[in-house]
């Protein structure tokens, strides 16, 4: 079971992000609380797998405000299209701890111009992710404590119990719009406390009692615009 869960990420075709899925986080950024899920896409090339020697979150020039967002990732086990909420959990193969790294000034500029968030969300190393936790190892995904520290300072701590849209609702909604494939990842949103990280700092994050990860932050050697 564990080996099968680890193989899922290798098959992933896309990462579906869910924005503003915690009331406190929506409010801390001055956003309204959504009435339906706010979705965005990230490419699988943005994955940064925990435990890989030398792997680090890269801050590209000229980004000055790269923010951390700790999230529960849901990993899909099989093709899912128009899935009803009642059977949505049958399509979950496992979970992971993920970070939705966000170049905040690029995202804010895109939002102001009415443009997609791609530059702020989709760059290489912007989705650090843990190993997959088999579904059978998670008794209640609606009651998991997420936490994140920067240089041992606690920045984020929250529970998936505070998510506005729960996992079955997200799977049903997303699969009504696009087909979810085996290995696809849903980032379910972040609790409050997001903030910037700088090159030279270290991020530690985890799901209490299940898994923890750490990533170094370094400056990318080239600007994303050259």
UniProtKB/Swiss-Prot annotation:
Requires a divalent metal cation for activity. It catalyses: oxaloacetate = enol-oxaloacetate. InterPro entries: Fumarylacetoacetase-like_C, Fumarylacetoacetase_C_sf. Tautomerase that converts enol-oxaloacetate, a strong inhibitor of succinate dehydrogenase, to the physiological keto form of oxaloacetate. SUPFAM superfamilies: FAH (SSF56529). It is found in: Mitochondrion. Its EC number is 5.3.2.2. It comes from the Eukaryota. Residues 1-30 form a transit peptide. This is Oxaloacetate tautomerase FAHD2, mitochondrial. GO terms for molecular function: acetylpyruvate hydrolase activity; acylpyruvate hydrolase activity; metal ion binding; oxaloacetate tautomerase activity.
